[in-house]
Amino acid sequence: MSFIPHKLEQIKKMLDTIGASSVDQLFDEIPRHLRADTLNIKDGINEIQLANLMRKRANKNHHNINYIGAGAYSHHIPAAIWDIVARGEFYTAYTPYQAEASQGGLQVIYEFQTMMAGLTGMDASNASMYDGATALAESVLMAIRSNKKAKSQKVLIAEALHPTYLRVLETITKHQGIEFDIVNLDSKNGKTDVTKLEDFANTNYAAVVIQSPNFLGQLADVDGITNWAHKHGALVIAVTNPMSLAILKSPAEWGDNGADIVCGEGQPIGVPLASGGPYFGFMTCKMAHVRQMPGRIVGRTVDLDGNEGFCLTLQAREQHIRRAKATSNICTNQGLMVTAATIYMSLLGAEGLERVASISHENTQTLATELAKINGVSIRFNSAFFNEVVIDLPVNAETFVTEMEKEAIDAGYFLGEYHSDLANSIMVCATEIHTSEDIKEYIEATKKVLARIGG
């Protein structure tokens, strides 16, 4: 049965109208050797055969214990969360088109905004962005629009920003006249040296970007950088891991006046690892900047009969006003992921989040301490971290990671591709899912691998 709706006479009429002799002629700009004449699809199979086939394919997966981190984190997600998310009311109506007709969906987003504003200490939150990297790019654009006192479209960025975030930021802003200056990393402690900021004191910046914990896992000197930025007329954009905020002070408490905009990757709070996505970005801000905030914002209101309800508010988006005037051209938010995050935070509560964050830090501390006891292995930076730490090895780190895979362990993130000075370094991450037995197995596997490859 053909699922192409056009009849042969309809196709002929369309081809005659545009002056083409055949459908193939429409694609003649594609070289012949790149075209697929046949799809080589086998005959259909029944459900039992399909289940057996997929089971065989699933058995090819390697179920390694994961210590990678670097922006995407393995956390336990209670079964109830995605069981609730998969309900039809959420699963098929996750994005608020004809929004007011879906009061339940709007309330979930409103609760999410409330929780994220509380977690970050900000006044307002939007309904989410695509991911952490695009949330940062939108935050930079927002800061430039909002900082009316700035005489330039320059942004100052600490070198320890996640490299993928930086690439996405450069891509999105490439043709918008925005320039970036980078503050070099202090190689001794893995973070920005506040005293180096004075080298940039004579340049006018619209915003300063601070990531903490930074890409190398270190906690930045957020107070010093925030105060410096505000002293020089720049807005502060905080990039952070939401899970870390359960035990660290919120960006609203950075420096004397706090950050102005907060963004980051929401994956750690209820979203599983899935080959890079879908995840979701979050963004919160002070009320002074809310009219420049992109994406959807849900507000609480009352209808004509005085009944409380929810609606989309401050809709300066491209669907409602001229594209050139819009604060955002995002076509949908990650509503389903937001639903998962909202349920995750609701079920765990403040104490549960704090417990997960604390155990993650403690397990990382234990792993790093035990690794440092191995001959030739050391902790690279002597400064505070959350749940990631850089480890120096006596061998090439990429080789070490490859060999550890044979021990059913994803040992960490190879940092050589990030910085040439870190060719013998990996970044390891532990969370609440790692048991003491897991950590012991990692240590023993490390000793075994180092002995095998000559460490």
UniProtKB/Swiss-Prot annotation:
The UniProt record lists the EC number as 1.4.4.2
| Keywords per UniProt | Oxidoreductase
Give the CDD domains listed for this entry. GDC-P (cd00613)
| GO terms assigned for molecular function | glycine dehydrogenase (decarboxylating) activity
Q: Give the family from UniProt.
A: Belongs to the GcvP family. N-terminal subunit subfamily.
HAMAP family assigned to the protein according to its UniProt record, in alphabetical order = GcvPA
Enumerate the NCBIfam families for this protein.
PRK00451.1
- The name on file for this protein is Probable glycine dehydrogenase (decarboxylating) subunit 1
Source organism: Francisella tularensis subsp. holarctica (strain LVS)
Gene coding for it: gcvPA
